Amino acid sequence: EIYTLSLHDALPILASLLTNVSDNSILLGYNSYIRSSHLMSAGYTKAIGERGTWALGAQMLDYGKMDETDEQGSVVGSFSAKDLNFQTSYSYMLSDYWSGAITAKVLLSNYANYSSTALGADLALNYFDEAHGFSFSAVGRNLGGQVKSLYDDGVKESMPFDLAFGLSTDFANAPLRVSLTADDVTHWDDVKFIQHFVLGMDILPSSNTWVALGYNFRRAHEMKVADKSNWAGFSIGAGLNVKKFKVGVAYGNYHVAASSFLINAGFSL
């Protein structure tokens, strides 16, 4: 449950599942990203009546310090770069099987002496049949655009709108769940067909533990070196639930020289 809250910032498909998150929950997350980049997040959820759930979240992606150079490439100083995301989500159970969600977000970027502001929204719809362990989701991501341009000419850009779909199913006789996500559907012809998909598998040895494996076909293709993938595109994670406290860790390989480590901790008040 707590991982739905932590992941819905990166995968808005999961925002429609917030109705399954524990009431009055707090989550903190940290992700050591490529090289000196770091992603930090915090979130809170609260049940609204019998069918609604409200969530509030914030994320900061800090790219660290970088060398500032002149036209000849000589280092003349350093600068930092950050992205901030503040968002609120509301999820509602439309029926026993269907739920929907909307997320509104404010995005702030600061790169050296340049800054920008954008307003955006995500829409999500989920069908979940608990008796058969089947789920289907659809999302429209990044509706909106800049209200303050990053550039001196004042040109404002739209956010990169995207459609994504996902489905998952449990196995009646095995502690497994498999999932398939189709991403970047609005740019279907930009890459090969298979590169739009992400495969996932959850291993559920008990009600309090889980292990997850994932494979991103596009990342594996784009990050391979000399026709060798070096495990690019693979990710692995695990989690433990102990009463009101939940913790999860994950590792993803982006490139032979770049990987990512994520840790979440959540507590139900």
Ranges and model annotations:
Residues S6-L269:
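Subset of outer-membrane beta-barrel
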Residues E1-L5:
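Short, exposed "boundary/linker" segments that immediately precede the start
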